[in-house]
Amino acid sequence: MCGIFGIIFAERPRRPLGEILRRGLERLEYRGYDSAGVAVVDRGLVVKKDAGKVAEVAQRYGFDSLQGVVGLAHTRWATHGKPDQVNAHPHVDCRGVIAVVHNGIIEKYAELKEELMKRGHVFRSETDTEVIAHLVEEYKKQGLDTFSAFKKALSRVRGAYAIALIDAENPRAIYFARNLSPLIIGVGEGFNIVASDIPTVLDHTKRVIAVRDGEYGYITAGEVYIEADGVPQDVAARIEEIPWSAEMATKGGYPHFMLKEIYEQPESLASTAAGLEPAQIETVANALLAARNVYIVGAGTSYHAGLTLAFILPRLRITPIPVISSEYAIYEDLYDKDDLAIAISQSGETIDTIKAVKAMRERGVKVVAVTNVVGSTLSRESDVVLYTRAGPEIGVAATKTFTTQVLTLAAVYLTALRALGHDVAEHQRELKAVPDLARKTIEKTAGTAKELAKRLRQRHSAYYLGRGAALPVAMEGALKLKEVAYLHAEAYPAGESKHGPIALVEEGFPVIFVFSDPNTGEKTLSNVAEMKARGALTIGTVPARSDYAKKLDVAIEVPQTSELFAPILHVIPLQMLAYFTAVERGYDPDKPRNLAKTVTVE
């Protein structure tokens, strides 16, 4: 939520600095925002900001004409103060020489604000962020240099934050700090960058340093300096080369990132399968079999991916405990050194998941991370990391990261199954075939999903039903429809639909069934009949050449595979259905309202 991009050059870049900042803002749009702004130093501090889309604000205030060698850009998601010109970032001090941008929430900021106002500081906004600019100003008044004043200000601040600050009186540095909110440094030649995440820096560099919780420092055009508790850190050893290209973070000819990322799934699955490290997978599988309790932790789509594993683990005589990240405290008294947690997060920065993992580790729980981002907070807080290799996912609604997470978890399950003496050769062959099956699924189902979207366009609600291992797929399908098409959708176990939900079913009410679990298909057909009898429009994802199709009004056939990999194939037409329904209803699926790609506040 919110986004930061700051860059400093040794000399004036060939393109105007404001244009570079504007392009950085465009890279941040996928994170979700309601306001945008920039600050540059050019014979003094210049700040331009307002509520609205990046393109609109940039044109209104002439971002592309701004010159200089150091600047900050920010997309804001309102938490304190309404989204308007005054509350948009950057914020400045009383004299208009310090500009600050901030992601997160400053706790008890009102007390600091009151203290500063008593000392004569004048506040312009309702935000918590503005406090930081005035604190630094106050300590500079006391004779401290900018960095010392910044550090002293940080000692007064509590909460989750990523901060970047520039000072027109010392314009050769960008100061930064991080606590529980993602922040990276992009390392260049003759320039350096501070940013919220990796896709934002790919136009400039692939070399990054992940700033850790509790760290602060500054960048100049030729130096990266980081401290923690007053101790300088070895930054050279922490530089990582990111295997993503700038082109991977563009639409590549598709109308939307979401559609592009749906179509990228065969490649992402192949990359993830090829990148599975047998030794690591075996370590996780053995830990799974040895654990007293197994917690599967995630939020949103990542939670649904975790459920695909949770629903089959009982076959290994393991009773999993699925944990929605924000509800981790429910099981706090149970956490023990003999337990295992599998924590899943696309970004590796989801605040609820990070907090859950930290609470578990404090009690000795071994943590396995499944994430898409190298060097993320989750990867550093975990004992073992399994990386999905989906490439950058820009669309707010997760698609390819869900299927690569499912594939990774299925590989762990297979290895545990083999450790128990089972023959998994056929499953291994299926794993290798999944990328090609995903490609065939996209080719065969896109047209049906597009036509079906026209029928859903005028509907107000829908049910997604599945039994057994099909339920997580139904849950993910319903979430996608809500996220991008703004069409109310609920997922239930198909058998549970009789206990209340069926009361809402009337003529034409869409009910989408998922037939990905071969053990429950026949029972699910009885629910199809119940819904049809009440006038529902029955839709289903079904294995090719099965008899299920005959019982449905609309059948979307996907290639046959085992229930272990079926969630990957059955979710693809549901992703496309959500996408095309959003387009039919006139919404931009890449920028769903009220949503952010990475949720970094509680």
UniProtKB/Swiss-Prot annotation:
Catalysis: reaction(s): D-fructose 6-phosphate + L-glutamine = D-glucosamine 6-phosphate + L-glutamate
Domain of life the protein comes from: Archaea
Subcellular localization, as worded in the UniProt entry: Cytoplasm
Enzyme class: transferase
Cysteines joined through disulfide linkages: none
A GO CC term attached to the entry: cytoplasm
GO biological process, one term: UDP-N-acetylglucosamine metabolic process
Residue stretches making up the SIS domain: 284-422, 452-592
Example of a GO MF term: glutamine-fructose-6-phosphate transaminase (isomerizing) activity
Location, primary (coarse class): cytoplasm
Keyword Cytoplasm: yes
Enzyme Commission no: 2.6.1.16
Keywords on record: Aminotransferase, Cytoplasm, Glutamine amidotransferase, Repeat, Transferase
Domain Glutamine amidotransferase type-2: 2-222
InterPro entries: GATase_2_dom, GFAT, GFAT_N, GlmS/AgaS_SIS, GlmS/FrlB_SIS, Ntn_hydrolases_N, SIS_dom, SIS_dom_sf
Record's keyword annotation contains Repeat: yes
SUPFAM superfamilies: N-terminal nucleophile aminohydrolases (Ntn hydrolases), SIS domain
Enzyme active site: C2 (nucleophile), K597 (for fru-6p isomerization activity)
Function: Catalyzes the first step in hexosamine metabolism, converting fructose-6P into glucosamine-6P using glutamine as a nitrogen source.
Assembly mode: Homodimer.
Protein's recorded name: Glutamine--fructose-6-phosphate aminotransferase [isomerizing]
Organism listed in the record: Pyrobaculum aerophilum (strain ATCC 51768 / DSM 7523 / JCM 9630 / CIP 104966 / NBRC 100827 / IM2)
Gene name of this polypeptide: glmS
